[in-house]
């Protein structure tokens, strides 16, 4: 059977908002960035992790509860938290570039440097950038479940670099739900209006990571991605 397209007329935006896709994604990214900081710190100080402490921050219109790494000697404190308390600076743009094709941004080190400025040395910025990129690539490439009852697509409002924005790129977060309505962030994909290859690349990525069937798909207007799911995934395995 083919995947069915689920339409949510008036309540589509509310339905997607209720999944807290953006909130979950922002939390994941900020915790990953702090983890990258902690790894660079550990390389220099050999101070191992010792659990987490909760921290509440405001970011992109959300109040997020973050897990902040503690270290045994209590010498580590993520500089990201200072930046967020000061308004966040260019952190949202760094988050955006982590999901765009490298050809559109020229690598993430420039944006890591824009975020941390003089808080880290050039050498530390280089290590932090490489660590963050490796962590994000691991997350983007992890294996997925073979079947999702529903896939939900939501356009993100993160600020894009001028070059990417001028080229028409937008970022779409993808949530997969199982039969118990448990949600899992599958990834974030850069797509352009009218470029069929971007939507096809999204589907090929899901297939390469193990997805074999999707029961239903809904979005806030991402027709090309919806149609790609309809064409390439059966409803059941």
Regions found by a protein language model. Name each.
Residues 1-83:
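Short, conserved DNA-binding cores of transcription-related domains
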Residues 22, 26, 30, 91, ...:
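Hydrophobic (often cysteine-bearing) scaffold residues that line and stabilize catalytic clefts
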Residues 65-72, 79-85, 90, 118-119, ...:
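RNase H-like nuclease fold core
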Residues 34, 73, 95, 108, ...:
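Residue-level signature of catalytic and energy-coupling elements of molecular machines
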Residues 2, 109-114, 193, 207:
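A detector of single, family-specific signature residues
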Residues 8-9, 29, 45, 50-53, ...:
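Electropositive nucleic-acid engagement tracts
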Residues 90-102:
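Short, amphipathic alpha-helical "recognition" segments used to contact nucleic acids or chromatin
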């Amino acid at each position: 059977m083919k995947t069915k397209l689920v339409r949510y007329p008036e309540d589509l935006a509310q339905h997607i908002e209720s999944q807290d896709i953006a909130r979950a994604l922002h939390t994941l990214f900020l915790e990953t960035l702090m983890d990258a900081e902690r790894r660079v710190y550990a390389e220099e100080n050999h101070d191992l992790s010792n659990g987490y402490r909760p921290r509440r921050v405001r970011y992109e219109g959300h109040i997020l509860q973050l897990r902040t790494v503690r270290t045994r000697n209590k010498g580590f404190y993520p500089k990201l938290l200072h930046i967020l308390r000061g308004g966040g600076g260019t952190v949202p743009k760094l988050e955006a570039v982590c999901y765009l094709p490298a050809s559109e941004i020229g690598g993430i080190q420039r944006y890591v440097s824009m975020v941390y400025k003089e808080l880290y040395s050039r050498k530390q910025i280089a290590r932090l950038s490489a660590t963050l990129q490796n962590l994000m690539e691991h997350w983007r490439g992890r294996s997925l479940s073979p079947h999702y009852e529903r896939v939900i697509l939501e356009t993100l409002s993160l600020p894009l670099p001028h070059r990417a924005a001028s080229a028409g790129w937008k970022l779409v977060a993808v949530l997969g739900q199982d039969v118990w309505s448990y949600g899992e962030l599958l990834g974030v994909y850069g797509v352009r209006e009218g470029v069929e290859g971007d939507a096809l690349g999204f589907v090929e990525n899901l297939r390469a990571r193990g997805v074999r069937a999707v029961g239903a798909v809904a979005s806030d207007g991402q027709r090309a991605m919806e149609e790609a799911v309809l064409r390439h995934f059966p409803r059941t395995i």
